[in-house]
């Protein structure tokens, strides 16, 4: 990658995503489940750039959306409505109404209250809402507590007993059609045994429902496949992942749904920034760059590790903190990281930032959001232009008092 040329053409900081890498990951995951009917629903929240969504739609991907805005993004990018599912804990009445009007595949319900709200909306529209229920199997995903979602103490899904009652209610409703079951126990899982454990619990529920003449069509295993951010980490084997799921579904005629996000896009992305200067005090060396936590918040929010390289710098290394210009002590990309000495304008590359990078960015400190680039078949193109100050104030300026 010619970072100097990219910096000259687009300036820094910027994100760049390798679309060919994403395609390869997508096809490998699809291949792992070829023994059974399956559908990938890409988790839009991981990276919602329209060009990236369009590329996946062209591969016949489905999309897992957690807001009506994400549903609209997927449709705008060319997704088929019947390959979109709508998940998330806090769906509003208006979001549910629009989802039904778009005639998406199904809505993942997270509570009894949400089911009753959806039923009332469907009744108003004189439609039958296709539903799946997110079951919380109370399985420990053994991941960061902020991204663990499968325990009773987490806000997601409903317990097995409540789910059973919800399915029975939906079966007898004139405006609800139960078509699937869903679970997602957490994100960034390098040990996939908890997913297999959860699949066994939920498959048992499906068999119980079948005995009650509730025949579901979709068995949605969520996402959660982890990626190797650090060199000592190993990614899950896709064959083992798939076989562990398939083993739980013997005798059940179900389409497997899966919701990869991070797994598809994280390692495709790099956040490229420039060194502004170094700062040294009695105890610590700081490398100050033109990117900041508003661009990439994962290190600040989760203490997440990202490999950092200086592609054109060599020489003796020493420990340093890599920090941005935000007025927060939590504004850092790395702490106590061993890097060579730097000078103003040196290029720094922060690796594995294709997921939850730009999609979690903000305008904190009135900083402009960065541009995004795609690398595809050896060619680099702009897929989101850099924001400017006028973009930031466009929705406020007209309200200034004369």
Curated annotation (Swiss-Prot):
SUPFAM superfamilies: Alanine racemase C-terminal domain-like, PLP-binding barrel. The keyword Amino-acid biosynthesis applies. Keywords: Amino-acid biosynthesis, Decarboxylase, Lyase, Lysine biosynthesis, Pyridoxal phosphate. InterPro entries: Ala_racemase/Decarboxylase_C (IPR009006), DAP_deCOOHase_LysA (IPR002986), De-COase2_C (IPR022643), De-COase2_CS (IPR022657), De-COase2_N (IPR022644), Orn/DAP/Arg_de-COase (IPR000183), PLP-binding_barrel (IPR029066). Its cofactor is pyridoxal 5'-phosphate. The active site is at 327 (proton donor). Substrate binds at residues 262, 298, 302, 328, 356. Pyridoxal 5'-phosphate binds at residues 224, 259-262, 356. It catalyses: meso-2,6-diaminopimelate + H(+) = L-lysine + CO2. The modification N6-(pyridoxal phosphate)lysine is found at residue 45. Its EC number is 4.1.1.20. Pathway: Amino-acid biosynthesis; L-lysine biosynthesis via DAP pathway; L-lysine from DL-2,6-diaminopimelate: step 1/1. Pfam families: Orn_Arg_deC_N, Orn_DAP_Arg_deC. GO terms for molecular function: diaminopimelate decarboxylase activity; pyridoxal phosphate binding. GO terms for biological process: lysine biosynthetic process via diaminopimelate. The keyword Lyase applies. It comes from the Bacteria. Belongs to the Orn/Lys/Arg decarboxylase class-II family. LysA subfamily. Homodimer. Specifically catalyzes the decarboxylation of meso-diaminopimelate (meso-DAP) to L-lysine. This is Diaminopimelate decarboxylase. It comes from Campylobacter jejuni subsp. jejuni serotype O:2 (strain ATCC 700819 / NCTC 11168). The lineage of its organism: Bacteria, Pseudomonadati, Campylobacterota, Epsilonproteobacteria, Campylobacterales. The gene is lysA.
């Amino acid at each position: 990658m010619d970072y100097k040329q990219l910096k000259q053409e687009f300036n820094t900081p910027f994100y760049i995503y390798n679309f060919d890498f994403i395609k390869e990951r997508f096809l490998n995951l699809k291949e792992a489940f070829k023994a059974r009917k399956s559908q990938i629903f890409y988790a839009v929240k991981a990276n919602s750039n329209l060009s990236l969504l369009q590329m996946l739609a062209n591969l016949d991907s489905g999309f897992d959306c957690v807001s009506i805005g994400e549903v609209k993004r997927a449709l705008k990018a060319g997704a088929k409505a019947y390959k979109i599912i709508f998940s998330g804990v806090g769906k509003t009445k208006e979001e549910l109404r629009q989802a039904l009007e778009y005639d998406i595949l199904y809505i993942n319900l997270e509570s009894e209250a949400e089911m009753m709200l959806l039923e009332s909306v469907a009744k108003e529209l004189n439609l039958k809402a296709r539903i799946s229920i997110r079951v919380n199997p109370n399985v420990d995903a053994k991941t960061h507590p902020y991204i663990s979602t499968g325990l009773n103490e987490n806000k997601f899904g409903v317990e097995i007993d409540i789910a059973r009652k919800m399915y029975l209610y939906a079966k007898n409703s004139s405006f609800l059609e139960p078509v699937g079951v869903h679970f997602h126990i957490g994100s960034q899982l390098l040990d996939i045994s908890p997913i297999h454990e959860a699949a066994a619990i939920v498959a048992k529920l499906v068999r119980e429902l079948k005995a009650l003449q509730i025949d579901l069509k979709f068995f949605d295993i969520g996402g959660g496949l982890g990626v190797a951010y650090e060199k000592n980490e190993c990614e899950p084997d896709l064959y083992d992942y798939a076989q562990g799921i398939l083993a739980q579904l013997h005798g059940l005629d179900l389409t497997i749904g899966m919701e990869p996000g991070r797994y598809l896009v994280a390692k495709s992305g790099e956040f490229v920034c420039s060194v502004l200067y170094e700062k040294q005090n009695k105890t610590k060396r700081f490398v100050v760059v033109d990117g900041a936590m508003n661009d990439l918040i994962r290190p600040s929010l989760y203490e997440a590790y990202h490999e950092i390289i200086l592609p054109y710098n060599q020489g003796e290394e020493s420990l340093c903190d890599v920090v941005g210009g935000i007025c927060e002590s939590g504004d850092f990309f790395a702490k106590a990281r061993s890097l060579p000495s730097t000078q103003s304008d040196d290029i720094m590359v922060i690796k594995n930032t294709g997921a939850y990078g730009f999609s979690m960015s903000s305008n904190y400190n009135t900083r402009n959001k960065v541009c995004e680039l795609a690398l595809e078949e050896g060619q680099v193109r702009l897929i989101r232009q850099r924001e400017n100050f006028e973009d930031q104030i466009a929705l406020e300026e007209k309200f200034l008092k004369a």
